[in-house]
């Protein structure tokens, strides 16, 4: 689960991490009032969306007057911000975060992720702050310095000092960085995070380290023990179909293609999407109904696919290991009868009760196209989506 920048910074403050003073604004009046409360004569206005690349998209701007903040709010509040991390529709801007600015001497990067191979937390630090860390890793990997944290023992101050030396910090800056490093690691572990980023972490002209941006991604599997974090969830930033899918324990990710895919098993789902792409098609979604699919879940999955107006054909690829193909067939029939359908549906069933499943579909009087192999199914789906 993603958090907004202002939410992450509020949590940062609880862990005694240095952040700028800011005010959350939900309306133009809030923003105008905020600039009279915050110090200084220049403020950073930031659109709050669950996506990176806000600055390049115009969603972050320095404002120096009431007129400028009015212009910024009128431009973005209630609108959608499109960045390189969003789809073509962008994310809705319901909140603007207005905060005090500082004079910057240097921009650094500090982030943490889970290394699943070693089952440890890896911190990454770099002098290339303010940049896309993926680009830095690809083009200049020598600029990234790492420290590995055992979650059972936590971060050690000496690890923070070692990173500080590599970043070229000196004097009191090293002490500040070590404190920041240890506290971020504590936050990462205690809040069950999957990702943590401070980009940029700046060194001000006064020699103080400051978290100028903050990104937190919480492991959704751990939310049951963090109700205070669950309460921070912003449904407006999530795809409505993905939210509906979660209610039925369906793994759904919306894409921009025109061939709906319903598959059981994440690996098979990705393989199905690859085969569709190989034959010139464009998947409209990733949808894994899971190994314990019931008739009801399959029905909901089918309705979910058909709710996408861009879908011109549906490819159902089921391998019956745990799940029974006859249940899948009954779910498809139930969904089609309930929702109605006027697009081709290609079905490939293999495994447990596959013959029975095919028989159920054949006797349903529905317009379904049977496929014997995955390659044939993909080819039929691509042709159907093209109207051939």
Swiss-Prot record:
Query: Which one GO biological process term can you cite for this protein?
Result: tricarboxylic acid cycle
Q: Which Gene3D superfamilies match?
A: ATP-grasp fold, A domain, ATP-grasp fold, B domain, Succinyl-CoA synthetase domains
Q: What is its EC number?
A: 6.2.1.5
For this chain's record, the cofactor binding note is: Binds 1 Mg(2+) ion per subunit.
Catalysed reaction per UniProt?
Answer: succinate + ATP + CoA = succinyl-CoA + ADP + phosphate; GTP + succinate + CoA = succinyl-CoA + GDP + phosphate
Superkingdom:
Bacteria
Q: Name one GO cellular component term.
A: succinate-CoA ligase complex
**Membrane-crossing segments per the record:** none
Q: Name one Pfam family in it.
A: ATP-grasp_2
Q: Which residues are noted in the entry as substrate-binding?
A: 264, 321-323
Where, by residue number, does ATP bind? 46, 53-55, 99, 102, 107
Enumerate the cofactors the protein uses.
Answer: Mg(2+)
Q: In which pathway does it act?
A: Carbohydrate metabolism; tricarboxylic acid cycle; succinate from succinyl-CoA (ligase route): step 1/1
InterPro entries the UniProt entry points to: ATP-grasp_succ-CoA_synth-type, ATP_grasp_subdomain_1, Succ-CoA_synthase_bsu_CS, SUCC_ACL_C, Succ_CoA_ligase-like_bsu, Succinyl-CoA_synth-like
Q: What does the UniProt keyword field contain?
A: ATP-binding, Ligase, Magnesium, Metal-binding, Nucleotide-binding, Tricarboxylic acid cycle
Q: Where does Mg(2+) bind?
A: 199, 213
Could you confirm whether the keyword Magnesium appears in this record?
Answer: yes
The GO terms describing molecular function are:
ATP binding; magnesium ion binding; succinate-CoA ligase (ADP-forming) activity; succinate-CoA ligase (GDP-forming) activity
Instruction: Name the NCBIfam families for this protein.
Output: PRK00696.1 (NF001913), sucCoAbeta (TIGR01016)
What PANTHER family does the entry give? Answer: SUCCINATE--COA LIGASE [GDP-FORMING] SUBUNIT BETA, MITOCHONDRIAL, SUCCINYL-COA SYNTHETASE BETA CHAIN
Record function comment:
Succinyl-CoA synthetase functions in the citric acid cycle (TCA), coupling the hydrolysis of succinyl-CoA to the synthesis of either ATP or GTP and thus represents the only step of substrate-level phosphorylation in the TCA. The beta subunit provides nucleotide specificity of the enzyme and binds the substrate succinate, while the binding sites for coenzyme A and phosphate are found in the alpha subunit.
Task: Report the family membership.
Answer: Belongs to the succinate/malate CoA ligase beta subunit family.
According to the record's subunit comment, the protein's assembly and interactions are: Heterotetramer of two alpha and two beta subunits.
Name of the protein in its database record: Succinate--CoA ligase [ADP-forming] subunit beta
Annotated organism of origin = Actinobacillus pleuropneumoniae serotype 7 (strain AP76)
């Amino acid at each position: 689960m993603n958090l907004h920048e202002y939410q992450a910074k509020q949590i940062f403050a609880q862990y005694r991490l240095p952040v700028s003073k800011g005010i959350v604004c939900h309306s133009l009046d809030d923003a105008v009032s905020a600039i009279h409360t915050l110090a200084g004569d220049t403020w950073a206005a930031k659109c709050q969306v669950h996506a990176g690349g806000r600055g390049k998209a115009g969603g972050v701007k320095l404002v120096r007057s009431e007129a400028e903040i009015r212009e910024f709010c009128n431009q973005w509040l209630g609108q959608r911000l499109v960045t390189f991390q969003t789809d073509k529709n962008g994310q809705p801007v319901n909140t603007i975060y207005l905060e005090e600015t500082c004079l910057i001497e240097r921009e650094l990067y500090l982030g943490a992720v889970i290394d699943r191979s070693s089952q440890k937390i890896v911190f990454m630090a770099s002098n290339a702050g303010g940049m896309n860390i993926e680009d830095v890793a690809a083009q200049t990997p020598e600029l990234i310095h790492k420290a590995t944290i055992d979650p059972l023992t936590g971060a050690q101050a000496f690890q923070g000092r070692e990173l500080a030396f590599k970043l070229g910090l000196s004097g009191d800056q090293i002490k500040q960085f070590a404190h920041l490093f240890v506290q971020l690691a504590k936050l990462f572990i205690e809040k069950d995070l999957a990702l943590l980023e401070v980009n940029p972490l700046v060194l001000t002209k006064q020699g103080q380290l400051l978290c100028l941006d903050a990104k937190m991604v919480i492991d959704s599997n751990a939310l049951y023990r963090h109700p205070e974090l669950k309460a921070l969830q912003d449904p407006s930033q999530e795809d409505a179909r993905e939210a509906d899918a979660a209610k039925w324990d369906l793994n759904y990710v919306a894409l921009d293609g025109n061939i709906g895919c319903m598959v059981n098993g994440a690996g098979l789902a990705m393989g199905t999407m690859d085969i569709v792409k190989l034959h010139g098609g464009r998947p409209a979604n990733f949808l894994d109904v899971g190994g314990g699919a019931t008739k009801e879940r399959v029905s909901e999955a089918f309705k979910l696919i058909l709710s996408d107006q861009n879908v011109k054909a549906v490819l159902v690829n089921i391998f019956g290991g745990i799940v029974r193909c006859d249940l899948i067939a009954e779910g498809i029939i139930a969904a089609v009868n309930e929702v109605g359908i006027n697009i081709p549906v290609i079905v490939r069933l293999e495994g447990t009760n596959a013959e029975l499943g095919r028989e159920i579909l054949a006797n349903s009087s529905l317009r379904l196209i049977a496929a014997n192999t995955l390659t044939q199914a993909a080819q039929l789906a691509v042709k159907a989506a093209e109207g051939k």
